[in-house]
């Protein structure tokens, strides 16, 4: 089992979280003190790593405020392809959605090392992209990441396709959150909660979308 104290996860996404909670007038200094992190250092080098233990404490701190119950959703919505460093820029150069998703699968460990991605095709010849935890995470942290990744996935796919194209489906293992109505505002994707037997996310895309350029 991987040691939770070893820095593995790029800090860039959690810096975005700090921006979000600061905008809600929540003290970020108390968070930094609790996690023993130097924000200035991480802002200067967003590819630096934090440990799973720090991430879990980070999420616990953020979610102890009731107003932050939609924080994972807002984090996902704030993440664009350019947020993923070099991998994101490489995705923008792909010829088709299928090519982009294969690139995501290949380099997902660079985006979020605590999760893994895989692709297969179902009997209807639809592409299914599965994203599952690679590490043992506390339930609160796990569900937070599943929601944030699912929303970011929708956001990123919509950067690559035209809004008038056919819709696609995103299945999640987590129950529908209290702010579930916000998901209805996200275009093109249809979200299905409590729909997987194992923790994670499954994206299903038709052939017509896969060939979109």
Language-model segments: residues:
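Alpha-helical bundle regulatory/interaction domains
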Residues: 97-213
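N-terminal low-complexity or simple alpha-helical regulatory segments
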Residues: 1-127
